[in-house]
Amino acid sequence: MLVYQDLLTGDELLSDSFPYKEIQNGMLWEVQGKWVVQGAVDVNIGANPSAEGGGEDEGVDDQAVKVVDIVDTFRLQEQPAFDKKQFVTYIKRYIKNLTPKLEGEAQEAFKKNIESATKFLLSKLKDFQFFVGEGMHDDSALVFAYYKDGSADPTFLYLAPGLKEIKC
């Protein structure tokens, strides 16, 4: 199994269990999340569910919780929304911190393509939920989540150059 860590903080953000699609010249990875019910245990001990007051359309058990698989698996922490000014300040600092960690062609590709990826992110800024890794470091990579038109499940965007592949 491959795990992808935040290059700056070491927080685990993604694994190969969640397939990704490269967009914006490989600067961003697009990953489909999914709402799942966690903690629901269906115990059927009787032969007559209607006599027990149990029906299949009752909804979700009190102890069951709906979570997004990626957020739950990697214990991502939701952050307050960013306005344009806050986001530009963040991305400038992130680029400054990340660039020296990249080598050779990766650094050149990053410098060449990060501006268009940043513009793409800015165009969707109002639609995003923002997440960081479990450690909640100041220098963490942001993970962006949004809902595509008509989708009930969130799509996540990762800044690909800021991820480090680790074999488990």
From Swiss-Prot:
Classification via PROSITE patterns: TCTP_1 (PS01002), TCTP_2 (PS01003), TCTP_3 (PS51797)
SUPFAM superfamilies assigned: Mss4-like
Annotated Gene Ontology cellular component terms: cytoplasm
Transmembrane spans: none
One annotated GO molecular function: calcium ion binding
Record domain TCTP: where: 1-168
Keyword Cytoplasm tagged: yes
Pfam families hit by this protein: TCTP
Keyword set, alphabetical order: Calcium, Cytoplasm
Localization terms from the record: Cytoplasm
Record-stated family: Belongs to the TCTP family.
Role description: Involved in calcium binding and microtubule stabilization.
Protein name: Translationally-controlled tumor protein homolog
Originating species: Solanum tuberosum (Potato)
Gene expressing this chain: TCTP
